[in-house]
Amino acid sequence: MVLFITLACVCNQFAHAQSTDENISLTITDRNGQALPYATVIVESAGLTYTADAQGRLRLKTALFTTKGTRLTVSYLGKATRQLTITHDAVAKEKKINIALDDNNLYLKDVQVNATRAPRHSNSSMLIQRNTIDNIQAYSLADIVQALPGKAILNTDMHNASFLTLRSALQGDLQNPLDAYSRNKLNDYVRNAAFGIAYVVDGTPLSNNTNMQLDSYGKWGGIKMFDRRFNTDNNENVGSGNDLRLIPASSIESVEVISGVAPAKYGDLSNGAVIINRRAGLTPFYGSVKVQYDIFNASLGKGFALGERWGMLNLNIDYLHSTRDRRDKLKTNANIALNATWTHTISRALAWENTLSADFSKNVDGLKSDPDATLNRTRTDQQNLRLALRGALSPQQNALIDGIDYNFSLSLSHQYDMHEEFIANNRLNLITDAYTNGLHETDVAPPYYTALLEIDGKPLALSANVEARRTLKWSRATHTLSLGVLARHEANHGRGKIFNAETPFYDGGQGGRGDRSYQYRNRIKLNQYGMYLQDKLVLPTAYGTLSTTAGLRLEYQNQRFAASPRINMMWALDNGLSFNAAYGISYKIPATAFLYPENVYFDRLVYSNYSNNANERLFMYKTKVVNPTNPNLLSPYTHSFEVGTAYANANFNTSLTGYLKIDLRGISSEAVLDTMWVQHYETVSQPPNERPFYAPKGDPQLIIDYYFTPRNLLYSRNAGVEWIGNLRDIKPLGLGVNFSVVYNYSLYHQQGERVGTSIDLDKEAVSGIYAPTKNSSHELISTLSLTKQIPTLGLIFNLRLQNFWFRHFNRHGFDIYPIGYIDQNFRRVYLDEQQRKDIRWTYLRLKDNEPVNISQPIIVPNCHLRVSKEIGKQLRLSCYINNVFNYRPWVERQGERIYFNQPPTVSMDVSYKF
């Protein structure tokens, strides 16, 4: 009710507006006149998506149609997407319009197999349709996003967590910054950029906010998981983006990627959005099998008609198995994913369409062991269950509100990581199990034992979003007003980190930082709520149409309020030329891994009296407990700017876009100097079969160590240019050409000072204080896609030529001289420009921090071939070869060859419609 009242107040601002409640009726059918139930219709100028009823019928307000025409996109599973423009005059003459869709196969002309610019929700939107997904023979979303301009085309990798970054040249591996293929190399800059992308599946947000599958943050100074500690597969995506491997490509109908300014309805993001629409429609059984050398993937789906009363049911199943190295049994991957979607009409009078969907996924490879090791076993289990209820209704004529959209979802995951190995306790590993400060008695671990570390997480996410909208006419302008409210609760109800102190991996109190258990349940939680208001303006002018989407999002996150204004503008001229601009601010809530780090336990052995007699044996250690939580941690946010121009006619379209994106308050770990006075003890006497007597040995010793705390330290400024074009048909060759040229530049560094890691208590300056390091990267990447289709044969060839023209990494903007130091009283002392270069502080100067300037020494081209053949209307055979010419240029650096292209990979795909 509050939502309706608020929207009424907004509508009151248009008191003199001409409100029209007239409708037109659309009927969506196939070429045989058979109705297509629950087809999707997108009114692009208004940014609205509608769903037809069980008879393929849909009512639209005539106010949505302008004199210069409104563009509609109509889609249905198994049918070719159709785009058409309908003018207001045509609507006035015909109140009923029939739209027929063709079967989607290779016998149609002009099959699009590339990502295309489609300004639906944003000027920067890129659309990847099902034909493109089939052409690249994608196994998961990780392969699909490689179709985006500027993204390297890589071999499928199911053994490293895959993430996406947009509009940046951030390097994942600073040790080898020119390696475009090290997708598993994460640093804090890349992690923040990937974490800031929102993923929305059929209107339901996917979240990685409460993923806590990590070892101690304060102990290691970042996100450290089993793959780093125990050399297993890299499943690391804590505090990073969603793992794209877990979203199978077989169930996806289309993907819209917003790399610039997203509409106000999308929140909890700072670096763009990925909107995924899955396959749903009335279809026969369809199946697909894809095979590579080390990957097997099978999928099956069907759309069932349940009658007019009960609507339609879609079922999809996907199975994938992969082996990275047949010699290493710890590195296999097997997953299964199930999806069921039920769509039905609740009320035809209200045009109330409702959809209930259920998703379940699980890895099924179970416990993995190394047969060559005495005992070395690892297990990574991940189960996900997601339930979503979404729908839309359009009240009758003369209602205050044109439509209401709603989306409610529940997501529950079980994440489990385990590693165990046999330990021969030759070093007398100690048992350190104290959770409090002070001295503690202990004993040595058994001579032989199995060390076990488990991390058990159960992320829970509840979300709700309700949006009401109203379309109004004011003179020649059309306003589509939207008002939404949202709420989101997330928590982690897992057992947490489970560690048996009596069977340690490391050397307990002799090693500094010890392992402890850490419970997640009733501790890890996030709450967000807010509202947004948006106006979509469409104004016909003498020379074209002006469209503006302006919105304001107000939300409460991380115990603070945030306001995000956003605007997308476009002026489309009648001659096909258009100009656009956009600006927006967006906020991303910090991950719980940063908000709720576990305590750090500094354990120091102070007394040792070993004996084979358990009554005489005694060890003591001192524990200091540190809480690394930063209560002042803020949400990272981004300013995004964008300008561009585009041109389109019947056979050719192109766009040129420039962007500037400033990321502020990115999260990284800061080393904090910690001091601990330790008094050692020595044995005074040893009575037979009794505890020893001990006394202090010498003076207390000062122990210096570090722990790590999360802070808003990172800054990055990203700028670039994107040129994209598409030529449908070069006659008489019948060749389609799609190209993209992308230049990205990124400047990224930490803000504030940093403390050196070298400590010397005998010096006047215990440790140095230095200016932050700065890095910059830029790159130029082009992709040329050549498509030859022979519709009469159902045959299509696609050749993708990708060039890395240059990649450059520069570390600069600092010097080797300290800006200050920490004295023996552990106070900070700062130096002026003359003092910092004094020979008195020579020992504080950095020796390994000279500026680095690395450039790609050669131009690196690559070529990839795809071939698909339709046999009849049921069977499709496909093959693709990455690096088809096996061109692998290399350079030698420090006696080692560095290759710039991956080895060739061949994949086969067989699809069949029963």
Whereabouts are the PLM-identified features?
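Gram-negative outer-membrane beta-barrel transporters
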Residues: 542, 658-662, 681-813
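Outer-membrane beta-barrel signature, preferentially recognizing the C-terminal barrel domain
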Residues: 587-664, 684-694, 701-729, 775-778
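N-terminal periplasmic "start-of-domain" segments of outer-membrane beta-barrel proteins
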Residues: 40-42, 48-57, 110-139, 144, ...
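Extracytoplasmic beta-strand/coil segments of soluble accessory domains associated
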Residues: 142-228
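Short, acidic, small-residue-rich periplasmic hinge/interaction motif at the N-terminus
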Residues: 27-31, 39-42, 73-79, 91-134
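Outer-membrane beta-barrel transmembrane domain signature of Gram-negative proteins
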Residues: 434-546, 587, 595-598, 718, ...
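C-terminal beta-signal and adjacent terminal beta-strands/loops
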Residues: 227, 662-665, 669-671, 803-825, ...
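N-terminal periplasmic accessory domains that precede
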Residues: 94-100, 141-144, 162-165, 200, ...
